[in-house]
Curated annotation (Swiss-Prot):
It is an enzyme of class 1 (oxidoreductase). [4Fe-4S] cluster binds at C257, C260, C290, E297. Converts 2C-methyl-D-erythritol 2,4-cyclodiphosphate (ME-2,4cPP) into 1-hydroxy-2-methyl-2-(E)-butenyl 4-diphosphate. Keywords: 4Fe-4S, Iron, Iron-sulfur, Isoprene biosynthesis, Metal-binding, Oxidoreductase. It holds the Pfam family GcpE. It comes from Pseudothermotoga lettingae (strain ATCC BAA-301 / DSM 14385 / NBRC 107922 / TMO). This is 4-hydroxy-3-methylbut-2-en-1-yl diphosphate synthase (flavodoxin). Binds 1 [4Fe-4S] cluster. HAMAP family: IspG. GO terms for molecular function: 4 iron, 4 sulfur cluster binding; 4-hydroxy-3-methylbut-2-en-1-yl diphosphate synthase activity (ferredoxin); 4-hydroxy-3-methylbut-2-enyl-diphosphate synthase activity (flavodoxin); iron ion binding. GO terms for biological process: isopentenyl diphosphate biosynthetic process, methylerythritol 4-phosphate pathway; terpenoid biosynthetic process. Its EC number is 1.17.7.3.
Amino acid sequence: MSKTLKIANIFLGGNNPVVIQSMTNTKTQEVEKTIRQINDLMSAGCEMVRVSVPDLESAQSIKLIKQKVRIPIIADIHFDHKLAIEAIKSGADKIRINPGNIGPEWKIRELAKVAKDYGVAIRVGSNSGSLRKDYEQKHDRATALAESALKEVSILEKEGFYNIVISAKSSDVIETIKANEYISQKVDYPIHLGVTEAGTHITSTVKSSIAIGYLLLKGIGDTIRVSISGDPVEEVIIARKILMSLHLRKEGQVIACPTCSRCEINVEQIAKTIEALVEKNNLTVAVMGCVVNGIGEGGHADIGVAGTKNGAVLFMKGKIVKTIPKEKIVEVLTELIVNRTDKLG
């Protein structure tokens, strides 16, 4: 089991729930835009958010951002440890450094002293896109990713700094898995999971679900980020669904059949219409295209419909309640979901 750290108001590691992260894609110095995006991410279920800090203005903007948001802010630092120090002084709750480009040992030691004084955690995050050549020459890429991060961790420890999170991300699923398995055998710091440069929506969803899901099932990982080339809110939604699928989160879900020639209703349209409402109400709702297997397959759902020639059969926990016309399916389901009651009206 990993150690437990406290990042602002979030407990990370140990027996605590897996924490969902994302990263803004706004210019951090554009404070109002960044605040809006962070609040959108928080509304979607994000619990910690990372912001890029490429310059002094971005580092100093963290102070203003912190005044308007209610989740921990992580400052993403490359190359310049002085920006990390400035971000800490501006109120960052956690720092991410890249061992591939942060520089010589004295810089890490200097950063560790300031982070220790301010009680701020550091994530050492290695990345396949910025591995040092000497590590690549000594090891296979997965081991190089892991050893690169572990070396930086050892420098922090020498400075008496143990408020550490560690990560190793590749754009390759297998490399990501192997690197994190390696790390989990060496240290007990909380591990942040993700696949870097995972791509656009579909590709990222597949890669992230496999790598993150596999590692979490093995008991590896304390916080996750799904990386998507696009709207970061989608990252949070997918992360939630990964955790829900692994029974690490409990929230509502729509189960729906893949449809075939027996389908009598527009399964996809109905499912999409009610999905957001279902998730908020912590129910399982089944939308099945026909009655052949629909009631049996959706029998464990709190509420469900199965299409018929003239409409749909409404069932609850596998028991048929009544039939409803096609044009009333969404209306009836919505009423039941909102009321969370067996009253049919």
